[in-house]
C-alpha cells in the first residue's frame, strides 16, 4: 500500500492510502514511522501505525487534561473514554503516564490531605469519601491519612464554630451544635468532643437567662393560643429542653415568667 495523502486537520493528520483506506494520525506518529507521501507500507505496518496513533492521540489528550491540574487515574481514564479510545489503548496510556510520574494517586491523596491540614475544615472520614470518589484505593488513602494528625484541624474548626454560635445558644445546645458540625465534617465523635473540651467556652448565667427569656417570648406566643395552666407549662418545658436548656434553668425561668 502506498500513502497518497498526508493532510493536516487541526490537531491531527489525515492519511490516505491508494487502496482507499483513511485514518487520522498524530504528528508523533509521522515522526516515529517517518511517514511521507508515496511511502509504501505493509498491512502489518499499517496496524502498528494505527495503534500508535491511537496511543499518541490518547496520551496527548491526557496531557492536555493534566495541564490544568493534577488528576487521578480514574479521572484521566474517564476523560479518555469520552473520545472513544479503545480500552486497551487507554490502559497503555495510563501505564505510560504513571511511569513518567504524570499520574500518581498516592501523591494526589497526600496533596489533598496536606492542603486540608493547612487551610481546610474536613476530617478524615469526609476526606476518605472524597478521595474514594476520585477512584483512589482504600489502602492508598489509609496510608496517607496515617501521616497526619487531625487534632489541629478539628480545633481550628471548633474555634470558628464557637465564634459563630457563642452567645446565641445555651451551654448544652452549644456543645451539641459544635460537636454535630464537627462530625458532619468528617471528624470522629471522640475527636470532636476533645476539640470542644479544649475550647474556652463559658456560657454565663446572665447570658443563659437572656437567651431563655428570649426563647420563652417566642414560644409563649405560639403555645398560649392552644394551652393554659399546667399543660402550657409542660409544653414550654418540653420545647425549651429540646432547645438545649437545662431543666433547672427552665423551671426557674417559668416561675418568673408565668
From Swiss-Prot:
Principal localisation: cytoplasm
Disulfide bridges in this chain: none
GO CC term (a single one): cytoplasm
NCBIfam families according to UniProt: PRK14135.1
Annotated keywords: Cytoplasm
Gene Ontology BP annotations: regulation of DNA repair
Protein name per UniProt: Regulatory protein RecX
Keyword field contains Transport: no
Function noted in UniProt: Modulates RecA activity.
Lineage of producing organism: Bacteria, Bacillati, Bacillota, Bacilli, Lactobacillales
Domain of life: Bacteria
Similarity-based family: Belongs to the RecX family.
Compartments, as annotated in UniProt: Cytoplasm
Amino acid at each position: 500500500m502506498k500513502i497518497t495523502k498526508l493532510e493536516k486537520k487541526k490537531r491531527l493528520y489525515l492519511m490516505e492510502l491508494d487502496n482507499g483506506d483513511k485514518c487520522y494520525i498524530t504528528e508523533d506518529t509521522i515522526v516515529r514511522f517517518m511517514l511521507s507521501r508515496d511511502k509504501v507500507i505493509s498491512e502489518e505496518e499499517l496496524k502498528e501505525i494505527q495503534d500508535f496513533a491511537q496511543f499518541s492521540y490518547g496520551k496527548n489528550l491526557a496531557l492536555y487534561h493534566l495541564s490544568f491540574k493534577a488528576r487521578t487515574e480514574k479521572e484521566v481514564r474517564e476523560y479518555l473514554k469520552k473520545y472513544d479510545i479503545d480500552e486497551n489503548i487507554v490502559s497503555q496510556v495510563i501505564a505510560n503516564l504513571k511511569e513518567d510520574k504524570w499520574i500518581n494517586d498516592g501523591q494526589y491523596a497526600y496533596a489533598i490531605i496536606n492542603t486540608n491540614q493547612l487551610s481546610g475544615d474536613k476530617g478524615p472520614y469526609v476526606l476518605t469519601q472524597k478521595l474514594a470518589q476520585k477512584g483512589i484505593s482504600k489502602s492508598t488513602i489509609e496510608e496517607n491519612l496515617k501521616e497526619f494528625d487531625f487534632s489541629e484541624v478539628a480545633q481550628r474548626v471548633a474555634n470558628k464554630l464557637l465564634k459563630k454560635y457563642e452567645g446565641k445558644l445555651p451551654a448544652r445546645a452549644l456543645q451539641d451544635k459544635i460537636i454535630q458540625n464537627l462530625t458532619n465534617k468528617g471528624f470522629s465523635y471522640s475527636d470532636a468532643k476533645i476539640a470542644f473540651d479544649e475550647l474556652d467556652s463559658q456560657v454565663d448565667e446572665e447570658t443563659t437567662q437572656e437567651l431563655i427569656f428570649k426563647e420563652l417570648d417566642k414560644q409563649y406566643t405560639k403555645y398560649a393560643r392552644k394551652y393554659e395552666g399546667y399543660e402550657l407549662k409542660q409544653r414550654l418545658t418540653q420545647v425549651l429542653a429540646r432547645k438545649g436548656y437545662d431543666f433547672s434553668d427552665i423551671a426557674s425561668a417559668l416561675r418568673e415568667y408565668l
